[in-house]
Amino acid sequence: GFFALIPKIISSPLFKTLLSAVGSALSSSGDQE
């Protein structure tokens, strides 16, 4: 099923890039607040 794909998605470089981008956006928006 779908859940079997989750570890592959999480370990993918694209996901890590996206995650770090989201983290940067969240931390920067938190700094502005």
Curated annotation (Swiss-Prot):
It is found in: Secreted; Target cell membrane. InterPro entries: Pardaxin (IPR009990). GO terms for cellular component: extracellular region; membrane; other organism cell membrane. Keywords: Ion transport, Membrane, Secreted, Target cell membrane, Target membrane, Toxin, Transmembrane, Transport. GO terms for molecular function: toxin activity. Its main location: secreted. It comes from the Eukaryota. GO terms for biological process: monoatomic ion transport. Pfam families: Pardaxin. Consists of a C-terminal hydrophilic region and a predominantly hydrophobic remainder. Belongs to the pardaxin family. Exhibits unusual shark repellent and surfactant properties. Forms voltage-dependent, ion-permeable channels in membranes. At high concentration causes cell membrane lysis. Monomer. In aqueous solution exists as a tetramer. This is Pardaxin P-5. It comes from Pardachirus marmoratus (Finless sole).
